[in-house]
Every structure is written in C-alpha cells, then in structure tokens.
Amino acid sequence: MVKQNDKIILAYSGGLDTSVAISWLKDKGYDVVACGIDVGEGKDMDAIKEKALKLGAVSSYMIDAKQEFAEEYALIALQGHTLYEGEYPLVSALSRPLIAKKLVTLAKQEHAVAIAHGCTGKGNDQVRFEVAIHALAPDIKIEAPVRDWHWSREEEIDYAKEHNIPVPINLDSPYSIDENLWGRANECGILEDPWQGAPADAFDRTKALADTPDTPTTLEITFEAGVPVALDGESLNLADLIIKLDQIAGEHGIGRIDHIENRLVGIKSREVYEAPAATVLLKAHKDLEDLTFERELAHFKPIIEQKLADTIYNGLWFSPLMEAMVAFLKQTQQVVNGVVRVQLFKGNVITEGRKSPNSLYDTNLATYTSADSFDQQAAVGFIKLWGLPTQVNAQVQAKAQAEAKTDKAHA
C-alpha cells in the first residue's frame, strides 16, 4: 500500500514508456523522482530532465556516468574479452548494474521506498535491474509499470494523449534501440525475421562496407596494466579514447554483429549490434596478452572469460563469483603493457605489430637464423618423456590384442 508522499525513483530515459510511467506511478500515489543516467547514449540530458519535471516528477536528476562506465564496467569487459556466446560484447548488459547502483544510491539519498524501471516482461533487462537492485538494497520495493500495465502500444498512446504526455515523433520507428559508449543494440521490426538482412537504417555507428574508405587507417594503441591509455601517442581518458576510436573504426565498417541470441528468459532473439571501438580494443588487447602471458595463464584465462561473459549477461554483476573473477582479471593485467599497431580496412581489424617491455617473445629462441640459441638436442629427451605415457599405452594395448588373438586361436 502506497502511503502519502512515498517516493519512488524512476529510471527515466525520456521515451514514451518511462514518460507514461511517471503519470501511472503518480496515479498509484507515489511522488516520482526521475533519474537519468548518461552512459554515452548521446542524448540531451538537460531536455530529459525538464521533460520529467513537466510531466509531474517532484524532482529530476541527471547523472553523468560515462567515465565511471568506461573505467569500471567496459574495462572489465575488455580485460575479460567478454563475448556472450562468442558474439555479443555485452553492450546493454554492462550498463545495467551501474544504472541500478545509481538508482539505489539516489533512493537512499531521497529516502525512497521503491525503485521503478521501464522494462517489459519479455527481456533480460528486467532480470538484470531487479537482481542488481536487490543485491544492493535487499528490502526495497521494485515497480515495473510497463510489465504490469498490460497495454498494447495503441492503448499506451491513448493513455499518453489523455494525460497530455508528448508522443515522440519517431514512435513509428520499428526498432528498439539501446546504446552506450561500448556499443549500440538494435532489435524488433524487420530484424525479428532471421532470414531478412538488416536494412541500412538499422545501423548508425558503422558505415556499410561499400561506403567505407578505399585506403586503410593504421593506429597504435598503448596499454598500461591492461588499460588503453593512448591512440597514436595521444593520451586520453578511457571514455574519450572509446569515443574517438568508435568514430574512426565505424568509418571502416568495423563492429557490425548480427546474432541469434539465447536470452536468459528462455527465448531466442535476433539482435543487431554495432561496437566499433570494442571490436578493435578486444582484438588489440588479446594480441598484447598473447605476447606477455606465459602459456598456462594464456590457456586458462579463456575459461574464466566465458564464465565472466555469462555472469554479466545473466545479471549477476554484484555476486561473490563476479568479485572473485574481477580480482583474477586485475592480477593478470599487471604485465599487459605495450603498444599494438592495427590496420582498419573494410570491416577488418588486422594486427600489424605489437611490442611490450613484458614480452615473453625471445627472438633468439624463435629464429631459424644463425642467431638461434634454442638447444634442439634437448628436444630428444623431452619428446621421449612427453610421449612416454602414449608409448606405454600403445605397448600394453598391442600386447593385449596379441594375447586375445592367441586365446581365440586356441579356443
């Protein structure tokens, strides 16, 4: 039961759903506090703030979280090489725990009794938001207006008109889009048919290959302890580096992903993603790890990477397992220092060179020239011992087969 002056924090985007949610929550008796979190969507946050107030929110907060998103969320995805099902760079999944954290912080500040989000009952985000919120504030109430009101799109528009809520002029767009610094996610409309190719208007951050430059761009990316810190020698904070690289790579058509995805809620969904900067950084970072990791670590880390991707996708950011995996990641990154040179061309990221003060590549051991320092005679004993279990097994099996033939002949 909602009491008079009970506050609720609404994750507010400025779109139709959360705009209608302000009125709907007010009808339930709440004082609505709108909260927009900027993780790099490129929206006019001041306009969104004013819109919330005009629609009846008692207060409206806009939080710039781009740098925090880059340094504490996207960076983990980069260092963990997280690709859900080997394809999806966790664009939306990465922002949800940060948004949830900001909502909970504001709820405590405003002494709110509840938090509301604008997710439907069909997607993954409802799970991510609610699990994250209750991990940080176990006893707070959660409202999900869009999931609860059971309206068709037409009924929602009728409600908006009755309550003088502006209907966006792009409402006829068939797509559902979410984006942040790390990439852009697109679904619905013609994309729901997995046989149909994604049309040109489904993309925004990448050029079609036919429209990309006919000459490649070469970049040098500098890493310190696994963190990208410079492009072509220009030092940049991580958020700015991602933004700049996103524009450069997008011009070359890099980072388009068309993926049939197994959602957490049990259905398959066709998703179209654009992640130009993420695609380049993931490639460059992996190449630098290949240069600096010893073999056992290089072979083990992908096991953690897959579990990390699943954990983030499934909304378990604030969990003991996640904390342990992040600690593992941070430990591994101490040697990931150096520069990677990549060529961007016609949708491809090609590594041309890499160097590191922590490189484990020894030219004198690897070369086949007269400078070779590898003791090839040591291979004789190594092969004998390495192959001994296989050799012994073969001898035992051969003996057993011979005895079986003898027994059969005497039977």
Curated annotation (Swiss-Prot):
Key word Transmembrane helix present: no
Keywords of this entry: Amino-acid biosynthesis, Arginine biosynthesis, ATP-binding, Cytoplasm, Ligase, Nucleotide-binding
GO CC aspect terms: cytoplasm
Binding site for L-citrulline: Y88, N124, R128, S176, E261, Y273
Subcellular location: Cytoplasm
Pathway field: Amino-acid biosynthesis; L-arginine biosynthesis; L-arginine from L-ornithine and carbamoyl phosphate: step 2/3
Top enzyme class: ligase
Domain of life: Bacteria
Quaternary structure, from the entry: Homotetramer.
Protein name: Argininosuccinate synthase
Source organism of this protein record: Lactiplantibacillus plantarum (strain ATCC BAA-793 / NCIMB 8826 / WCFS1) (Lactobacillus plantarum)
Gene that encodes it: argG
